[in-house]
Each structure stands twice: as structure tokens, then as C-alpha cells.
Regions:
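Solvent-exposed interaction patches of small proteins and small membrane subunits
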Residues: 1-123
Length: 123
């Protein structure tokens, strides 16, 4: 079973790497508009809006991959525990193992991802 979990971790890390690469590319292209204010957001060109869309999409996909694939796989690999547990319990345990710096930070970024995914500025 360890080999299967290791493969799942490797696959998730590879996917995360692709999302991070696209996020970094988008950030470079968006650098001139940061810090992003309401006025700057309203003045974005169609091309800049497309890049911002790509950034938001990749941020959401990265969060999904980490939360749905990587974190559970790392937990199973480290704890050899396949019992289904509440996600917050897994986060807290990984924080205690120093895999995560903060379970609260993870929840904050997950909440941010959910807000971005469900509240998009009208244009």
C-alpha cells in the first residue's frame, strides 16, 4: 500500500507544480496592476482580465489538488491510517507533525478560494 500512496503523492505534487507554474506566469503578467484596487480592477483590459481569470482558476485548482489529493495522501503515508477522519483533524495532525505550518492558515486560504470561486466581479 505504501507504493500506491507514494504514487498518489507524486502525482498530486506533479499536478500542483503545473498549477504553480501557471500561477507564477499569470502573476508576472499581472505585476503592473498590483496592488489590485477596485479602480485598477475596473480598468483591466480584456487580456488582463483573461490572465486574472487564469490566475483565479489555477489558484482554485491548486487548492483543490492540495486539499483533495495531496494532504490526505501525505496523512495516510505518514500515519499509516486509512480510517476516514474529518479534514480538520487531518490538518491538525499534519500541523503537529510540522508538515503544515498552520491548520488555520490552510482554512483561511480555502475560504479565500471559495469566496473567489463564488463571487466574481461583474464586468
Amino acid at each position: 500500500m505504501d507504493e500506491v500512496i507514494k504514487l498518489k503523492c507524486a502525482s498530486a505534487l506533479e499536478e500542483c507544480g503545473k498549477h504553480i507554474q501557471r500561477i507564477n506566469t499569470a502573476l508576472k503578467l499581472l505585476d503592473p496592476v498590483f496592488p489590485l484596487t477596485e479602480d485598477r480592477l475596473n480598468a483591466l483590459s480584456d487580456e488582463q482580465t483573461a490572465v486574472l481569470d487564469q490566475f483565479l482558476y489555477r489558484f482554485a485548482k491548486l487548492q483543490d489538488c492540495i486539499g483533495l489529493r495531496l494532504i490526505p495522501s501525505v496523512y495516510v503515508l505518514l500515519e499509516n491510517d486509512t480510517v476516514v477522519r474529518p479534514f480538520i483533524d487531518i490538518l491538525n495532525r499534519l500541523e503537529k507533525l510540522d508538515v503544515l505550518t498552520s491548520a488555520n492558515d490552510w482554512q483561511y486560504f480555502r475560504s479565500l478560494r471559495n469566496n473567489v470561486a463564488h463571487e466574481y466581479p461583474e464586468r
